[in-house]
Structure formats: C-alpha cells, structure tokens
Amino acid sequence: MAESVAYPEPMSILIAEDNEAQRRYLCELLASEFPEFVPVLPAADGEEAVEIALRERPTLSILDIQMPKLSGVKAAKAIWKEFPEGRIIFWTQFPHEIYINEIRKIVKSTEPTPTYGFIHKNNPENRLLRFIGAVLEDGADMIDPAFKDSFQRPLLTEFESEALRYLALGLSNWAIARKCSLSNRGVESRLAALYEKLFTSSAAGTDCEAYDKLAYNTRTRAFFEALRRGLINSDELETAEKELEKWFERDRKKFSDDGLLK
C-alpha cells in the first residue's frame, strides 16, 4: 500500500467507463457523495482516460477493465508509469484472473507502490461508497472479498501465461520448445511448475496422487482450470493464434531449409 500522499488542490476524480448510463451514474453519485473531490471527469474509453489522467492528475481514477481502444488494466499501467501517486479502482463486471494477475504484476513493478482497489460492479451502492471512501480518503488498498482468493494465488510467470495459450491451441512440447527457444526438458520442467500452481494436488506419494495421474489428462485439465479461473479468454486465444500462424510459416521454412524434413 502506498503511503499517504498530500495532494495539491484542486482534487478530482476520473471515471472511465464505456457504458454511458453507468458512467453518468458514477459521475453523479460521486459528485454528490464526495463534493470536496469535484470535478468528476468522465472518459468513454481507455485512451481518453490516460490522456485526462496525465493532464489533470486526479486524486482517484475509477477504471472499467474492458473498454474500447485500451483496457482499464493497460490504462492503469500507462497512468502509473507517469503518475504512481494516483489512486486507481478497477470497477468491473469481468473479474477474470488474467486481468487480476496483470494488475498484480503492474503494482509490483511500480515505484512507489500505488494504492488501488478492485471491486465487482454488482455491489450495492452503500458498499461501493464505503469501498471508494477507503481508497480515496484513507489511502487503503481494497479488494472485493469475493476475489481475495484470486489475489492470493501464485502469480504465473510470462512463460506460464504464454504456455497456457499454447496448450489451449493444441501445441506439442516440441513446438513450444521451438517457439520459446527452449529444450524439450526445459519445457517439461516449466509446465510441471505451471501445473503445480494450477492444481490443488493430492499429497505426493499417496494413492490419491497415483490415481489422479492415471485418471486425468494433465494438459486438458490445465486448459479447463485456466478457463474456469479466467486465465485465458477468446480474445487472447484469437490474438495468439494469429501470431502463431505467422511464426509457423517462418518456422516451417526454417525447418525445411535445415533439412529436418528428410
């Protein structure tokens, strides 16, 4: 949690939400409940949010996660890069772990450590206001209790996040090794570490562990667990598939030129 910051006057709040009705609701609510922090500055997409935040330096920014042009997570990264003292609340209908992990990594890499909150849009108004007040006035990090488990799980490395997409797209260990410039053994050890993070496994050496290894296809279960927790989504997979198609075209040629098809 960031230390208390003495903000220069005037203080303000930024609301970044692409849904016009929700944006208007938040603007009117916060202007009424926190009059000392007016004006409330509206933004309809992530790019506009970054532009306003870096120009006006609001005390608090409330960012929807899924917005046109730039996601709320990427907007927060751009804002904190120039203005780490700014407090940010992620207000979302889609609390998938792919976003939560990205937020945690950004917070961890930002100096000084920023103050932030993460809350579901379905919360009642009185709880939302208490939540905002804690971040805005007290400088407290606030996580919606419904998602505390997601924030406490082991963070995936860049390779592990990438490997999940490759598993979902059906790549073999051989292909992953070529794509990531690793040995097959290196891929196997890294995937084993990924599986340990994804699964609550049976105690090592027990009959239950032996049974589970026979009963489940680990790669398929990893894909299921990633979907269940929101560690991958269709947009990420479509982007990864397009990038892979270009890589496959280059790698097939290299494979052929190296005489490995014989």
Locate each region found by the language model:
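Basic, Lys/Arg-enriched C-terminal extension of HTH/homeodomain DNA-binding domains
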Residues: 196-262
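Residue-level marker of regulatory loop/turn positions in helix-turn-helix DNA-binding domains and
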Residues: 5, 68, 155-156, 214-215
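Conserved long hydrophobic alpha-helices within structured protein cores
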Residues: 18-26, 84-105, 179-201, 220-229
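N-terminal regulatory/sensing modules of transcriptional regulators
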Residues: 1-144, 241-262
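Helix-turn-helix DNA-binding segment
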Residues: 145-202, 224, 262
